[in-house]
């Protein structure tokens, strides 16, 4: 290895640090450099900074991956000669690491034999796998209307407080615990409490030994939040490429990745684009999303939460994310206001594999029947609000009655929400889900009270609940 390049800090502006190197000694862009920041702790080289720009006059502009309070001009900066590299493989399982691969769970160093750079190229077209298989989530509304492709990318879109994280936690619970393979959970700019809760839940349920957790939460500076998604993805890519595994990759929240990029972008002197986002929004997101794919070696099935600012799906951040996904689960505030959870909008959510050739004719027909019924009910709501139900034709009254039952049957108690609701969670198999909705559409349960369909698992539970209420 060539002689280590050493520079000195010339300027610190928030998370952006300017470093001057000797002439002809400039490190490459994206290289990681280290500096000792007494503001963090006394450990040498405790702060990692990543080179973002060469400004001229031997000065590099860098982005800090931790706090810069405590840095002063003239401090010595050492180039590592490599991009940020993290420990990967078996040693990383059951552990929590931060953006630069250092453990944050207080259990000592991560004993990994291999390390990888977080900046990698996406797989080639020739390496991509195109086989379509369905992943069962056990959540009725998703399995029926927005089937998940195994090895695909799904997004959970929703405004603040609509329940994105709860649905993702339920999926971690349902899929990771039934799946038996490797899971990687990446917390990007979200609440530290949620990360802590997930860690403890995984520990209690025994999934932790097969999971790697990578956190860069709200307290982290924007440099860490803009890179932690790449760190998590690199951990997942190792299991896919080197061990040929089918990996589950959960990200909460992709919007924070974009938000961190926009925070750093202005400090790097780029002129903001639409709504104040960075001009490189599509490129940054594309570089991340193109790496989340299935190859002929193994697969990555990704579930990504996407915060929707002010419930506006046309905002550049969620709108750019839409283009990369195989399916979108859109959460609606109107549905959550009705008390129906998960608050998935059955008419706004889409999946690429809602196709009779993939899921079968019966499932497809029932899903479309449910959507038609709910759409007609939506169209009639204004008339009902003004004139009342009695003014509708008999046929329309029957349609509305069934649609209201369907709407309530789309709700479901979750295992992860059991502590709040007091109701035990339900995992419903796809065949039972399809059968239940088919029976409602056919009118087999017209005599049942619509409230009997609220917060139950299978259709048999709704029938039993109705019988109990009449007893």
Swiss-Prot record:
GO terms for molecular function: ATP binding; ATP hydrolysis activity; proton-transporting ATP synthase activity, rotational mechanism. This is ATP synthase subunit beta. Gene3D superfamilies: 2.40.10.170, Bovine Mitochondrial F1-atpase, Atp Synthase Beta Chain, Chain D, domain 3, P-loop containing nucleotide triphosphate hydrolases. It comes from Desulfotalea psychrophila (strain LSv54 / DSM 12343). It is a peripheral membrane protein. The gene is atpD. ATP binds at residues 158-165. The keyword Protein biosynthesis does not apply. InterPro entries: AAA+_ATPase, ATP-synt_VA_C, ATP_synth_F1_bsu, ATPase_a/bsu_AS, ATPase_alpha/beta_chains, ATPase_F1/V1/A1_a/bsu_N, ATPase_F1/V1/A1_a/bsu_N_sf, ATPase_F1/V1/A1_a/bsu_nucl-bd.
